[in-house]
Amino acid sequence: MSTGTFVVSQPLNYRGGARVEPADASGTEKAFEPATGRVIATFTCSGEKEVNLAVQNAKAAFKIWSQKSGMERCRILLEAARIIREREGEIATMECINNGKSIFEARLDINISWQCLEYYAGLAASMAGEHIQLPGGSFGYTRREPLGVCVGIGAWNYPFQITSWKSAPALACGNAMVFKPSPFTPVSALLLAEIYTEAGVPPGLFNVVQGGAATGQFLCQHPDVAKVSFTGSVPTGMKIMEMSAKGIKPVTLELGGKSPLIIFSDCDMNNAVKGALMANFLTQGQVCCNGTRVFVQKEILDKFTEEVVKQTQRIKIGDPLLEDTRMGPLINRPHLERVLGFVKVAKEQGAKVLCGGDIYVPEDPKLKDGYYMRPCVLTNCRDDMTCVKEEIFGPVMSILSFDTEAEVLERANDTTFGLAAGVFTRDIQRAHRVVAELQAGTCFINNYNVSPVELPFGGYKKSGFGRENGRVTIEYYSQLKTVCVEMGDVESAF
């Protein structure tokens, strides 16, 4: 399949083990191919009736799935992981077409996805409570039990990967899930739904409903939904938390960020430059944990900046399905204009554009209406500038200088966000000292934007709470039951 040829021809809702048209509507949406600007799908947003049908299907499947042993769930999740590996090329291609990221990156995303399923398959077979001995031969024990029907609401920057990150631990714990993708990227969640069905989950265990805010509201407020996990913006996360609170539903929120990346003068310069590029330009800069505030110690500021600009200008922009492309288009026209607007404001506030920050028009005529821009490096930045304070969510790096460790820590933490942070230094004592002081849920030392599924991922402050990945996520998709067993006579006060 090549860029500019794909059109959705099947229903984009998934319920009861099959693709279906929604039973009712709450509006329509269009999905675009960012590389060309073509409409690839016009679809109906799910209304309250469709959401209820999806939840009821999930509720019925939950009764079957939750009674399976951990080993049975393990085998099915491992089979799903195997199918993802087998279909890696097809899924990665769909991700490129609907999201715009390069095929190089998309393959990495799909690999992380099947690794996530394998990881939680292993945990499914080893979940256990504990036994506590009490006086007189009595004892207590705990049971880790599933929650029920969980809701996943995904973002558009990692469509398939986020679907996997939310569904794998949920299903491993014995839950069912109704998933709502972003209306910008409705396609790839359906592929995972079909894979789960092929692997052997009960029909209805994993359902997909398409839609926007109204559909999300129906999900969050549904009385039979036990938990909501959301990835997206802070304002939307606040609304989801408020809606879920009315039903006393636990939530996991993975929200925005404005993360600091601290480059000390004793760093390995080559690795620090590569780390800064990884921290700013993956997925066209549309990554919530990106280290977009790059603090560089003054002694190496000029050398570091020169090398970063040189490497940024070499990034190959173009057709995301070509093997040598390293940066594709942004997600859509309004977002492209928003990011360009941030660059304009940065210049007005005194920042200097060292490269990029403007529209890029590929030579291939079929890409002329795509949403491309050149990756941007800003210098002469101050902490009070809009480009330094607000999440841009595009390929825009802001370089700031600093003198001392104490100074940069204070400035790095001066934000309402706390999703991620990074430090490059050869001084291992300094590295651990600095990350201990950084107010961020995920910290990197001498690397950035790596995401092993074995490690928990999540934020501090307004970047959200709860975690995805790692063993701890089991706690967010299960509940603990305590059982107290008396082996003697009841000692009564009456």
From Swiss-Prot:
<feature type="binding site">
    <location>
        <begin position="232"/>
        <end position="236"/>
    </location>
    <ligand>
        <name>NAD(+)</name>
    </ligand>
</feature>
<keyword id="KW-0560">Oxidoreductase</keyword>
<dbReference type="GO" id="GO:0140087">
    <property type="term" value="F:acetaldehyde dehydrogenase (NAD+) activity"/>
</dbReference>
<dbReference type="InterPro" id="IPR016163">
    <property type="entry name" value="Ald_DH_C"/>
</dbReference>
<comment type="subunit">
    <text>Homotetramer.</text>
</comment>
<feature type="modified residue" description="N6-succinyllysine; alternate">
    <location>
        <position position="303"/>
    </location>
</feature>
<dbReference type="GO" id="GO:0006081">
    <property type="term" value="P:aldehyde metabolic process"/>
</dbReference>
<feature type="modified residue" description="N6-acetyllysine">
    <location>
        <position position="298"/>
    </location>
</feature>
<dbReference type="InterPro" id="IPR016160">
    <property type="entry name" value="Ald_DH_CS_CYS"/>
</dbReference>
<protein>
    <recommendedName>
        <fullName>4-trimethylaminobutyraldehyde dehydrogenase</fullName>
        <ecNumber>1.2.1.47</ecNumber>
        <ecNumber>1.2.1.3</ecNumber>
        <ecNumber>1.2.1.46</ecNumber>
        <ecNumber>1.2.1.19</ecNumber>
    </recommendedName>
</protein>
<feature type="modified residue" description="N6-succinyllysine; alternate">
    <location>
        <position position="30"/>
    </location>
</feature>
<dbReference type="GO" id="GO:0047105">
    <property type="term" value="F:4-trimethylammoniobutyraldehyde dehydrogenase activity"/>
</dbReference>
<feature type="modified residue" description="N6-acetyllysine; alternate">
    <location>
        <position position="30"/>
    </location>
</feature>
<dbReference type="GO" id="GO:0045329">
    <property type="term" value="P:carnitine biosynthetic process"/>
</dbReference>
<feature type="modified residue" description="N6-succinyllysine">
    <location>
        <position position="59"/>
    </location>
</feature>
<keyword id="KW-0963">Cytoplasm</keyword>
<feature type="binding site">
    <location>
        <position position="391"/>
    </location>
    <ligand>
        <name>NAD(+)</name>
    </ligand>
</feature>
<dbReference type="GO" id="GO:0005829">
    <property type="term" value="C:cytosol"/>
</dbReference>
<dbReference type="GO" id="GO:0018467">
    <property type="term" value="F:formaldehyde dehydrogenase (NAD+) activity"/>
</dbReference>
<feature type="binding site">
    <location>
        <position position="180"/>
    </location>
    <ligand>
        <name>NAD(+)</name>
    </ligand>
</feature>
<dbReference type="InterPro" id="IPR029510">
    <property type="entry name" value="Ald_DH_CS_GLU"/>
</dbReference>
<dbReference type="GO" id="GO:0004029">
    <property type="term" value="F:aldehyde dehydrogenase (NAD+) activity"/>
</dbReference>
<feature type="active site" description="Proton acceptor">
    <location>
        <position position="254"/>
    </location>
</feature>
<feature type="modified residue" description="N-acetylserine">
    <location>
        <position position="2"/>
    </location>
</feature>
<dbReference type="InterPro" id="IPR016162">
    <property type="entry name" value="Ald_DH_N"/>
</dbReference>
<dbReference type="GO" id="GO:0051289">
    <property type="term" value="P:protein homotetramerization"/>
</dbReference>
<feature type="modified residue" description="N6-acetyllysine; alternate">
    <location>
        <position position="303"/>
    </location>
</feature>
<keyword id="KW-0007">Acetylation</keyword>
<dbReference type="Pfam" id="PF00171">
    <property type="entry name" value="Aldedh"/>
</dbReference>
<comment type="pathway">
    <text>Amine and polyamine biosynthesis; carnitine biosynthesis.</text>
</comment>
<keyword id="KW-0520">NAD</keyword>
<dbReference type="GO" id="GO:0019145">
    <property type="term" value="F:aminobutyraldehyde dehydrogenase (NAD+) activity"/>
</dbReference>
<comment type="function">
    <text>Converts gamma-trimethylaminobutyraldehyde into gamma-butyrobetaine with high efficiency (in vitro). Can catalyze the irreversible oxidation of a broad range of aldehydes to the corresponding acids in an NAD-dependent reaction, but with low efficiency. Catalyzes the oxidation of aldehydes arising from biogenic amines and polyamines.</text>
</comment>
<dbReference type="InterPro" id="IPR016161">
    <property type="entry name" value="Ald_DH/histidinol_DH"/>
</dbReference>
<dbReference type="GO" id="GO:0005737">
    <property type="term" value="C:cytoplasm"/>
</dbReference>
<feature type="modified residue" description="N6-acetyllysine">
    <location>
        <position position="344"/>
    </location>
</feature>
<feature type="active site" description="Nucleophile">
    <location>
        <position position="288"/>
    </location>
</feature>
<dbReference type="InterPro" id="IPR015590">
    <property type="entry name" value="Aldehyde_DH_dom"/>
</dbReference>
<comment type="similarity">
    <text>Belongs to the aldehyde dehydrogenase family.</text>
</comment>
